Structure formats: structure tokens, C-alpha cells
Amino acid sequence: RAYEYYSQINPAAKNDSIDLYEIEPYVYAQNILGDEHPQFGLGRNSWLSGTASWCYQAGTQWILGIRAEYDGLLIDPCIPSKWDGFKATRMYRGVTYHITVINPKHVCKGVAKVTVNGKQAEGRLVRAGEGLSEVSVEVEMGS
């Protein structure tokens, strides 16, 4: 459900009603006039909201599930079951992490296996890649 809500507030989701919304299709509005107002659906005060940064955090850390922790990156996706997976690149402590998540069982949540540079990791935490410039991470979702 998180992705469903995330998609609903995404500015691009309003492209089909852009004539009503009337603000840039790529920014979050500070407010959208409600159904009691004569100009229902009209967006106002674009660029004055901190919503973009919060939505970035929600999307990357809680939907894609790539979170920085003290000892490394925690990989814990919560994605729509219809997704086959996704790829992401994340810089963390000067190291570039190339992350591939596959979802063969089409689950919403749960990690079956994490492989780091070809070796199976314990749990969902990818330890910091000290002394490396790049790290390859493969995550298989499942129970």
C-alpha cells in the first residue's frame, strides 16, 4: 500500500488533470484546493514545500528499502508484488553500491538471500565496503 499512496501524491500522477492542477507537473504543491472550494483541484504555492525531500526518503529508504545504518546498508524492500525487481545505485561512505533486487516469487516484502560481490551475506545488512570503490549487491526477495 505504501507504493499506492506514494504514487497518488506524486506530481506526475496529476498529468491527466494538469488543466485543473495548473502548476508545474514535476513539483509538489504546498496545497491543493479541496472539493468545497470553487476551484477544486487547483495546486498552489509550488516550490514552497519540503515534500520532495520527504518523498525521496520514503521512496528510497522505505519502498526500495535501501537504508544507511552504522555498520552498512540495510536492504529491506517493500515493493508492489507485481514488480519483477529493480536496480539502484547508492553511494555510501565513498563506495558505489550497484544493487539489483529480483522478485521471482512476486512478494511485497521479505528477503530470501543477499549476495555481495558474489558471496552470500548473513542477513539483510551489507557491511561497509572498506577499501573498495564499487560493490555489487544482489538481493533475492522471498520468505
Predicted stretch roles:
Residues R1-S143:
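Non-catalytic C-terminal accessory modules of carbohydrate-active enzymes
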